């Protein structure tokens, strides 16, 4: 008698696939026994998962290991060419903007990067540039979009580039290009990229502050290894802190008030600072101003980032890759 698999059984199988693929990407290559040791699954279960993944070319069977007296063990690796990810963000304002992009393999390696002038400043231009990149790199199956504003469930609530305001950007791009799409705000992606490149493994909160040319301030936070988005994706909108004429203050005073607020609320271990109005020379003054309100033992480490570009692109690529892997596993 054949017993149909229930949802719990299906979810267990999916979890096994995710464990094996994540371990393969982390290790580079591995045998069934090595995967069993890392994942906690049995060798037989790892073998069954690898057989399924090999049949759809998601995993590659490599050379046999040199025998130490027994049967040679087969090594496996995740196929970097199984798909590619396009990470892309628009930065600037209605006065001037550009599109910055990168393409990564299924295992995260950078394949190409570039930037494009965002002219004319229309949705049609934005979608046309994405279409051109998809044509140039036909293996792209997932697209991550970053925008300078508030993005709620794939729809842009507000944006420094007003053409995006109110646009259901995820839905429109999925319908137009037929690929997986996710969109989020610039600071969430950038904070995650900084966390992964500089603070990976730290459970204490980490924050990223960006001071652009325009009178506002952006913030992204990672807590317990997760991006803090909030109940309605409004977390990090520090320009709304109740300080009178905050954006009229000298940059050091404005930043210090926000750093003190973050320290009192989430107590971060590290705060990264970036933007055209920030320099490394500003950090000593910032620390001095903060220490007027914060006891020294609670003062976070301040780290200057000359550019947010690599943090931003890494954040988009890693989060999109992770979510697309789950999308594949669940077959959605």
Residue ranges of predicted features:
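ATP-binding/phosphotransfer module of carbohydrate and carboxylate kinases, centering on a glycine-rich
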Residues: 1-111, 121-132, 136-139, 227, ...
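Short glycine-aspartate micro-motif
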Residues: 85-89, 140-144, 205-210, 218
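Short, acidic Gly/Pro/Ser/Thr-rich loop/turn segments
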Residues: 93-95, 150-152, 215-217
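Conserved protein kinase catalytic core
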Residues: 95, 152, 192, 230, ...
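Hydrophobic beta-strand positions
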Residues: 103, 150, 220-221
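Glycine-rich phosphate-binding loop and adjoining helix at the ATP-binding site
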Residues: 110-197, 202, 285-292
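Glycine/GP-enriched mid-protein hinge/lid loop-to-helix segment characteristic of carbohydrate kinases
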Residues: 113, 176-268
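Short secondary-structure boundary segments
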Residues: 147, 210-213, 275-276
């Amino acid at each position: 008698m054949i017993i149909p698999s229930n949802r719990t059984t299906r979810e267990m199988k999916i979890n096994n696939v995710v464990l094996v693929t994540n371990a393969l990407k982390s290790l580079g290559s591995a045998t069934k026994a090595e995967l069993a040791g890392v994942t906690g699954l049995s060798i037989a279960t790892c073998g069954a998962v690898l057989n399924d993944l090999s049949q759809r070319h998601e995993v590659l069977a490599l050379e046999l290991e040199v025998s130490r007296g027994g049967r040679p063990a087969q090594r496996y690796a995740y196929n970097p060419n199984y798909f590619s990810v396009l990470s892309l963000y628009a930065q600037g304002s209605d006065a001037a903007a550009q599109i910055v992009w990168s393409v990564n393999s299924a295992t995260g390696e950078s394949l190409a990067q570039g930037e494009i002038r965002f002219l004319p400043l229309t949705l049609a231009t934005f979608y046309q540039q994405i279409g051109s990149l998809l044509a140039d790199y036909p293996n792209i199956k997932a697209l991550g979009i970053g925008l300078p504003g508030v993005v709620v469930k794939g729809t842009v609530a507000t944006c420094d580039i007003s053409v995006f305001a109110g646009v259901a950007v995820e839905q429109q791009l999925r319908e137009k290009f037929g690929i997986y799409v996710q969109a989020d705000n610039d600071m969430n992606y950038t904070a995650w990229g900084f966390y992964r490149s500089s603070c990976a493994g730290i459970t204490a909160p980490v924050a990223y502050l960006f001071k652009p040319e325009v009178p506002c301030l952006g913030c992204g936070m990672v807590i317990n290894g997760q991006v803090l988005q909030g109940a309605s994706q409004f977390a990090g909108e520090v320009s709304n802190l109740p300080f009178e004429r905050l954006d009229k203050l000298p940059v050091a005073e404005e930043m210090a008030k926000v750093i003190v607020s973050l320290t009192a609320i989430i107590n971060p271990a590290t705060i990264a600072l970036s933007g055209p109005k920030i320099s490394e020379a500003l950090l000593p003054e910032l620390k001095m101003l903060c220490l007027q309100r914060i006891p020294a033992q609670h003062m976070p480490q301040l780290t200057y980032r000359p550019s947010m570009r690599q943090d931003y692109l890494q954040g988009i690529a890693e989060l999109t890759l992770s979510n697309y892997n789950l999308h594949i596993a669940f077959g959605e």
